[in-house]
Amino acid sequence: MNTSHPANLPRRLLLGAALSAVVVAIAACGGGNDDNGATAAARNVLYVVSNHPTPGQNSILGYTRAADGSLTPLPGSPFLTGGKGHNNPTAGLLGPNDLDQPMVASKDKKRLYAVNAGSNTIAVFNVATDGTLAAVPGSPFPSEGRNPVSVEIAGNRLYVVNKNEDADQLPNAELPNYTGFTIESDGRLTPIANSTIPVVKNGSPTQVLASRDDKLIFGADFFAPAVQPGIGSLRSFRVNADGTLAQAPGSPLALPAGPVPPPPLPLGLYLHPTQNILYAGFVTRNQLGVYTYDAVSGALTFVRAVANSGKEICWVRTNASGARLYTVNNIDASVSFYDNTNPLQPAERQKLTLKELGPMFLNDRGADSFLQVTSTPFQPALDPSEKFIYVISQRADATHPAVTEGNKLHILSIAADGTVSQPGAPLNLPVPPSARPMGLVVF
């Protein structure tokens, strides 16, 4: 029998072939993807918030990533956000730039959200397959407060921290806050009624962070004078069905007082990827704080603080399994690697000092003053392959016009044992000396 002729093929085979052809055609047209405009998620890209303090000039710096971790600017970069960054005309003042997650990507990597910290708005972009960005209609959107510094996605909602420490907007009578938005299908942000949680004046909230199931929100108030003078606090909230936030039992929770000053100030919250554990940098104590949390109530329990050999541990990240943990230590410009096999007792194994740190300047904190490097590291990000860590550095001394460099991006290599090295020089970021670039998103 000649089975190659269509008339001789069984009807079910013909039907199967036809259905397969339809599926292929739909896939080729992108019909199986989300509705935010991209046919496939971008890969091998990196984004930085320029935090440009000139009105209308804040932007997202976009790069493609090569196999060796090196970076090449994306076509069209920088991508304007429609707003301005915040201003910090000081020499390393605590507070204004103490923040985390000023930019976040959707889980499908097709949309990007970033703060305009100096114009009180949130920029929203669609991410094309090639990594280029296009603002969604109506972007940027009011942040419902002053000086937004941190954003987080929880399901179809976006939560924001408004810090209210932008020098160009002080003094004012508004309070810092945590607040929420509904993310509409086209990316627009709609404020959630009654979702705003005010923070005490000068409380300096730094971050908003969602649990794995999006049912809890965590935050850190860097200064929390209403909780306990001179000691920061952590917050946890349950996310209600309507998107409003309910304080968890014991929240806000003052950080544990130690035997000697200085008091602990919290920064750089990060969740263990598989267990109910929260990590926090105790900045002025040079310690890594370890907490557990109740998955239902959100209540936090302090476990311990482990030593960090750097100076002012500020940002924390783990790898995908949670077995490795990395911290950025701000004042001595170092990165620490911890063996996190026991996630309740991380053990520091290495500290690496970054390259090209610039001249020293006096960070004037009165009796606690010290010399600090000009190019000071801030937020880190691991790439998906876990072969590289990117660390952003800012020109931290804004009081000396002659010192114009310091805004850089460091590329660290991760060895098989988790230790890090810096084979090459950092990348100079194309921002003016007055800018304090911040935040990294890496696909």
Model regions: which residues?
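Short glycine/acidic-enriched loop and turn motifs that connect beta-strands
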Residues: H52-G56, S119-T121, N164-Q169, F223-V227, ...
